[in-house]
């Protein structure tokens, strides 16, 4: 079946003679080794190739889903041959898009010059400039394109200072920050999660940077070590790149952001690597600001994975799985590309500002109370908004045309209609947060709107043509007159043709024009027989919509018309260039308008997500950080409840300062422990984004971090065992968590021996409950840890309920108070359809171990009784001896205690624990 699929789109073979192939093999060998994450393409004008076994296999699987298309340049010479895969331009673009945007590979394209091959284009996940036309032509840009550069410096006192510079090329934005960090780079990881870079520039991967490399690998960020070059002048570069306010001196010297010297040096490296200064489209359009991490809730990579915040790489919003695979998919009902991008930022950047969150919640509530308005905004207005940011970038790079300018004009026309709909809601928050900025931006864009109306020929647009008004130039007037006359003649031929073929009314002959055919006639397929009888006309082609045909006269007029049209477009080029030059001056208000429309799209999306859920979401009541309260009634997991054939059983959580700050959750495997703690974490995250939450009631105090340790899988590729991953992630939690944090931990300590694992889990749970006092959901199989509730009043035990008898085992997925008294491992194995003989064997082994334990306890109990009898006799004798002193008596009791301790008796331990309590 696969062979048939690939044969249907067979690629051209590599048309090179034997001598040319041998020369190419020699050239390819001279290129030497390349990084495994770099793929080299070779442009043969009419096709592209990749070479080498690794690149061929990778690209063949991307393009053809098969390695059957891998060939050999010299199939008869196995010693000197070189593998290759050949592909069309369309498949080359498909491969480049997959490599750069999904798989985080670098791409190089070589072009043949007169005598040799030279590299023409380079691209990486964080530097897509040279591939933008390939990647985003007729494609929505749904993800950000950011790159970071960082430097690490050890201060005199041994403190580790990190300087980070982020460059967002889509938004033309520089962000700088510096901070002190620990040996594990905890703050740096939070920064990487927050910014979501595709690529990171490092000066080295050794020494201090070795741990940084490990962190970046863990977060799926490509690492690049740029070549050291001559010192570029940062101030000079910024003076050219930055957009200064009107009246502001164009001098970056006094910018407060540049006081961050380490981050500034990192920025200098990024500007040089991206070659920003040599692209005229960047000049005068960038903004620079200092990033404040304290504005955002701290997220580590473990929490991002545990809460399923982001979908799997390559998952497009149009895919069915996108909706339930991640929190982003659940919330993302955006209609615009800029809305999709902003939503991706928001879910990774939960806020700590209660005021901003209340504004977002107010707007979402208002939209939910006006469902007709919500649908109008989503389906009628936002759906028709193009990607203004990408259109603005085309303007800045002087690659825009009149059609692009007209699309921007349409947005300027539609925005007042959106404003009118929003005004009708009569909501003060919407007026201040959305409407007021819209009015300001529209005022700034008045000049652009007027220019388009004066210059663009709107009548031509109705015919699908984008032309400058002829009144702007005498030669244009002349050419337009010629085209008008030619069109009139073609209409006369159309009328004459209808009469000749005896077609009128609905069946009349239509005059049409398409790019490949020019002007032609068209009739319905059922009238085909009438046409074939007339020798004055000849059929061009037959399509589903009808029969296209022409005549000698029509063809002559059509050719003349096309010639006039070409000359018209050539004549208007200089005028269009001047219009685009003027339009570039409106880049700033266009960018702001784009951002405001993206924000509206996200808020409407929140409302749609809240209403369309199986059970509608509710507005969370947000309290200040110090309130320390988390009450969620009937909380559900937003992803799980969207899946088919799932009837979600909701549960609740109730944390209050000084009353309860930790749930220790026990219960059988598959009983719902992980889902429960993730549901709580996800609800808190959604509230801090500004969305409503999947509960029946929610009261949430602001948190400063959401930290997680969920799941246990060996990270073999990075050389880390289950236990090492556990320890790395958990140590990060201990270092970062405060009394304002939410921590979710699942099955900690299972990667090592039972006793060590239990000891570590106990110690961490006790530290979080007693010292940190953060809100913690601690799911565990170590029932011993439930004893913490006996010594710490703020720790509560709960379990996932299950019912079992001799034949049946039912998981109830309900959280109930108290400890799960019984283990159900064997029942779960049977539920998972283990072979019955395996289950029976497990039961026998279990019974054997339990019998041994009982026998051991019986022996220990007998020995204990003997010791007690001896002790009683000795104490009785001592008590009757009036000459015995206190020291001798104390020594006797102490020895008795030691003897019993050596017996390792459970009974004695419980008595001792009770007496100590």
UniProtKB/Swiss-Prot annotation:
PROSITE patterns referenced in this protein's UniProt entry, alphabetically: DNA_MISMATCH_REPAIR_2 (PS00486)
GO CC annotations, alphabetized: MutSalpha complex; nucleus
GO MF term list: ATP binding; ATP hydrolysis activity; ATP-dependent DNA damage sensor activity; DNA binding; mismatched DNA binding
GO biological process terms, semicolon-separated: interstrand cross-link repair; maintenance of DNA repeat elements; mismatch repair; mitotic recombination; postreplication repair
Compartments, record wording: Nucleus
UniProt binding sites for ATP: 667-674
Cited SUPFAM superfamilies: DNA repair protein MutS, domain III (SSF48334), P-loop containing nucleoside triphosphate hydrolases (SSF52540)
Subunit description: Heterodimer of Msh2/Spel and Msh6.
Task performed by this protein: Involved in postreplication mismatch repair. Binds specifically to DNA containing mismatched nucleotides thus providing a target for the excision repair processes characteristic of postreplication mismatch repair.
Official protein name in the record: DNA mismatch repair protein spellchecker 1
Organism: Drosophila melanogaster
Gene name for this UniProt entry: spel1
